[in-house]
Amino acid sequence: MSSLRLGPVSYLVLGITALRGPSTPYDLKRFVQLSIGHFWPFPHTQLYAEPERLAEAGLLEETREEGGRRRRHYTITDAGRERLGEWLEEPVTSPTEIRDLGVLKLFFSELTGIDEIVALAHEQAAAHRAKLAVYDGLMERFADRPELATRLLSVELGMRLAHAAAGFWDDVQSAASASESTASGDWLASITAMRSGSEAASAS
């Protein structure tokens, strides 16, 4: 078995080729754009380079078209399936990462003013609702494809996170609009009270 060190993009490529069969690097890019990329974007350069690396290690098999554009097609090998299966069985011990530019700006928002925070919150709430609309469209589009149920679970998680994030930014906007200063003692209390109210409503 190959001892090649594999990372997330490696398993992404192995997983996609296992699901859809022979794939060109462009096929991989399009697959990511329409699915996984909604919750984990991968650089296109990696998606174009990784298949060749995996093929050299015997985890993918490369075939080239004889005519035309002579595109390279990659198919997962038995060794590739074995490595993919081992990875799928490994426990996930790393915590969920959230890299959100809006949250980063919010952290430093005491250096700005209330108007800027209100604007940031409004923009972020709208962005998360736009993402929610995309997820809704995916769920509707594939509603009659029961064989895709496990893939759509990731979309369901995305919907829940987008809904929660939009609600959070709504609360920030409301609290900021009612406050005169980011240093106001009522600032945090107002937002936590909104959270408590939301939790009580969900429990009832």
Where are these regions (language model features)?
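Extended, low-aromatic, Leu/Ala- and acidic/polar-enriched alpha-helical coiled-coil segments
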Residues: 155-163
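Amphipathic alpha-helical coiled-coil segments
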Residues: 162-175
